[in-house]
Amino acid sequence: MERLDKILSSQGICTRKEAKKLCSSGSIIVNGCAVKKSDTKIDPEKSEIVINGVRLEYKRYIYIMMNKPSGVLSASNDKHAETVIDLVPDEYKREGLFPAGRLDKDTTGLMIITDDGDTAHRMLSPKNHVYKLYRAELDAPFTDKMKETLESGITLDDGTVYKPARIKSVSSGKTTVEIEICEGKFHQVKKMFAYSGANVTKLKRLAVGGLFLDESLKECDCRLLTDFELGLIFDSNNN
């Protein structure tokens, strides 16, 4: 059971303060009866909630695919810079949204935004081996020695350990490489390539597990994930 105002806020319908006004005006009907108090507790999954004549399609959690642009922070909020949450359309906004994992400010591509902490933890935990696929553009040709270094795992001078990566493809010009990692440490892909002898000049995330970025999404755009797409993240055949 949850408070009605919390339910409406979580679904992006209105703020809790606005919910109080809606209730006072008789605009909210629950199971056929007007609810006058916004702190009334109901079961949102078993109740019919109608706001101004429109039935609420309740979703316990929301999962959003975004094509993150460069220059935007992977954070819920920031006083000085634009964040991925700022880019979420009003129709998807609700309390508790956060990016499931981080991309560097200048990294683009697949970002998953949700309010489901358990699913995000499952996706990000290294023990679950959910691989993330990136396309890296380099300032030097990619060599067999670099491939061997990356696929063997790396230990930096400061003691940071990176698990072995998987090289999926290399462009004919040898300067664009698709690489998979199952971790998400700070600047990991850039640091791994730098250790192997090349600097990353551009980085884009293409996939998480078996879920690939919808290429029809322009940078800054987003859409909801289907249940099937959500399951692809954890498809063992892709991890």
Q: What residues fall within each predicted segment?
A:
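Basic, flexible Lys/Arg- and Gly-enriched helix-loop patches that mediate nucleic-acid binding at interfaces
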Residues: 1-239
